[in-house]
Amino acid sequence: MEIKKVYFSQKMSLYSPIQQAKQPLPFFQSHQESRDAFWRSAKKQCAFKAVSKKYTVYFTIAKSRGDVIFNNLLIEGETFEWKKFFRYMEACARFFIKENCCFLFQSPLSEEWLRIFHKNGYQGTTQLNKKLVYHTALVLGGGAHGAYQIGVWQALKEHDINFEIITGTSVGALNGALILQGDMKKAVNLWKKLSTRQVLALPEMAAVEDLRERFYRERRQMTKTALIEGGVSSAPLEKMVKDNLDLSLLKHNPKIRLYTVSTKLPELAEVVTDIQQTKTEEIPDWILASASFYPAMAYRKIGKNKYADGGYRNKIPIDIAINKGATEAFVVDVQGPGPAKKIRMPDIFIHWKCQTLWTLGSFLLFDSQRNQLNLQLGYLEMKKRLGYYYGNWYTFHSVKPARTYWRGFLSYLTKEIQLELSFFKSIKFWQKLRNLYKNRVVPETCGLAMLELLAKKHFLLPNEIYQVDMMIQMICQQDIKSMPDDLLAQIGQLSTEEWRRYRKYQQKIQNERTKTVYFDYLLQGKRKDRLQHELLKQPVDTLLILYLYYLKEEQPWHKNFHMKS
């Protein structure tokens, strides 16, 4: 099941299917009243669409502290029996992570309707309520960037969200064991201080301040050692695991089950290990086997068999969580190499993807500064998934001011510069913007998308919670013509691909300078025809430049009159 918000701007594309959808419950006196009410709720951003293999359900909700309250509902597709219907809607309610599923009606229900609700476990008359039952899993993917996963756990723990099952591959197996122990401080401190030599047995290297030079030296050293020795020894990782894990505590945890994934060699067969059911002395072996990225690292021998990283067969083990009884899962993908295993999820299985759009650094080369950044990213991403903050690339207390600024900008383009904005009706424009933003963009969220893209161009880091006004001020003060001197020191070690993009952007800086000067000339000279030409030729790039100009023009007003927006 996939649940997405429905925006009013989608009315044209969704008009036909919603006109064919019907309300299964008597929220309104007619189906048409229900459809009209759905679009009114879409204007208030309270409308959603749930899609599964058989059904598409459109619904609107209100939320209180512990309740999800359905107040309108339309179904497209064949009708199902009541038991399946309520299970489906309760799955939709679990998506919002509340205690109770409620249905609120404007008029008293008939005895027959009350009988149907009460038979399916609901209580009440006008508002029908039922306590939701959760069997939650935490799915920890492979990919070395384990600090991000611990950041996610910090946010979950902060809001008392518990899970019955943990499944982990590679670094996810190690973190699963740390989480099973429940010692947050130990897990955070471990990742904050972790370096490559605490994981892999590499020869000592002279200290190097330059991050790029250090990266290439460590990579060459790792490659050479792996080739000579048939995989770098993970003896330091083994010591760290044994020093930090309480095996008795892991073995006898009564509330959470931990399952790890490894790959048996040479068959390349997936092996799932129930950590609590294995021998106590073998627990470190199975965790290390799951994290042995052979041939870069040495394989792990358990008994007579050889095992390597579980990511070769199942890098994001959602299917194991489902097979062990999970009805929903927080899935933490940390950008491990290789494709994910294809699985078929049950219609009523809910999963929340907890992954960042930002790259997380080098694979197998660990850096304490980058780990601290990734910890913060994981924490903030999970807080957004839980609905406490907002944003896509960045994290905001509220994004409403972004919509206000954007409306002001569009008015500036049409009324002051008198530009024509027909490209907003072009599918290509929205496709390009979505590809650049790497997420869904609709007219209602366009202002936020453009603001975040500007923030990226101006090197703002994503590891803090922003106010929209504060972000705009920082964007306007940051010179796009050069990267901040301390940027790399704040980020930490980069990956090969990140270094490549870093060099590429340094080469593009001159082009950015030229563009800025050119558009400043057009705006100062009010060259409407040239501006219109550029806007139609390259709408996304041109909009970003014009939006920055507009925001800079607005800054003096906002400094003195902060309530303008």
Where are these regions (language model features)?
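Acyl-donor binding region in acyl/amide transferases
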Residues: 66-120
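Short, high-confidence coil segments that cap the C-terminus of an alpha-helix
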Residues: 44-45, 98-102, 324-327
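Patatin-like phospholipase
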Residues: 31-35, 64-65, 126-166, 178-565
